[in-house]
């Protein structure tokens, strides 16, 4: 999602928008590299310890651009999976936004679900709950997908 008009914003402006949207204070994640482009926003990336996955952490600005950026970056490193944490309230809308369809819904003991999804290219994704927030209406999810 692009915040407002497509225009150049400073990193501080993107951070302010990130904090307003997430209601969390931005703090650079240790071990992650921050990438920033004035017309696209910012994104933090790092590999897992075994280099099997490229992780996208905090991000603001054009999400589809940063997904594509991370995909190319991972391909350069020979990595075949991407991962992130979704803090959006509507996980099914999030899955659709990225072009996936749920193929399987696995119920968990706490009433939440693990979602398995696939896009038009046959690439698979797994979306699993990681944290149920205090108000119980919001769940954060680990999202991993093949590239």
Predicted features along the sequence, with ranges:
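A conserved beta-strand-loop-helix scaffold within acyl/acetyltransferase catalytic domains
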Residues: 19-51, 129-134
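Short beta-strand micro-motifs in enzyme catalytic cores
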Residues: 33, 52-54, 111-115, 137-143
């Amino acid at each position: 999602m692009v915040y407002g008009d497509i225009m150049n914003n400073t990193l501080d402006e993107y951070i302010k928008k990130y904090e307003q949207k997430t209601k969390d204070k931005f703090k650079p994640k240790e071990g992650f590299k921050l990438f920033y482009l004035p017309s696209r926003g910012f994104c933090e990336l790092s590999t897992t310890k075994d280099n099997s996955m490229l992780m996208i952490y905090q991000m603001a600005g054009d999400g589809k651009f940063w997904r594509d950026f991370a995909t190319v970056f991972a391909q350069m490193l020979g990595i075949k999976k991407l991962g992130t944490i979704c803090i959006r309230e509507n996980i099914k809308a999030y899955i659709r936004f990225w072009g996936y369809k749920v193929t399987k819904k696995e119920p968990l003991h706490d009433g939440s679900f693990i979602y398995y999804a696939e896009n038009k290219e046959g690439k698979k994704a797994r979306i699993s709950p990681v944290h149920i927030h205090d108000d119980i209406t919001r769940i954060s999810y680990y999202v991993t997908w093949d590239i």
